[in-house]
Amino acid sequence: MLSPEAERVLRYLVEVEELAEAVLSDKRQIVDLDTKRNQNREGLRALQKDLSVSEDVMVCFGNMFIKMPHPKTKEMIQKDQEHLDKEIERLRSQLKVKVNRLFEAQGKPELKGFNLNPLSPDEVKALKVILKG
């Protein structure tokens, strides 16, 4: 049997390890989705370069190739890009929360500036107007 102090330390270590594993898992998933997003971007660029819109194109799904109409393929990849963007953004927002929980469990202060969001185009325009005048 472990002493109460040893059990408390063990619970603490297990909690920190679980939180760290969740952070690493999300980071890995973001990297994987970003890789897929880059591959889609390459595919869209190749479709834009190809001027023969009337022809069918070969698309790779896993380990098989399928012949599809050019416009349908482009639309499908664009929808996939939108889905990937949303999923990556969702994971990034979850990651911020998980990192803060991990820091809290370790007794470290919360990261400053970690929850900052970029300015929207409208906010940038307003800021430029204020700075000029």
Swiss-Prot record:
Disulfide bonds: none
Record InterPro entries: PDRG1, PFD_beta-like
Protein name: p53 and DNA damage-regulated protein 1
Family designation: Belongs to the prefoldin subunit beta family.
Protein's GO biological process: protein folding
GO cellular component: cytoplasm; prefoldin complex; RPAP3/R2TP/prefoldin-like complex
Annotated compartments: Cytoplasm
Domain of life according to the entry: Eukaryota
Keyword Protein biosynthesis listed: no
Native organism: Mus musculus (Mouse)
Annotated keywords: Chaperone, Cytoplasm
Role noted for this protein: May play a role in chaperone-mediated protein folding.
Molecular function as annotated in GO: unfolded protein binding
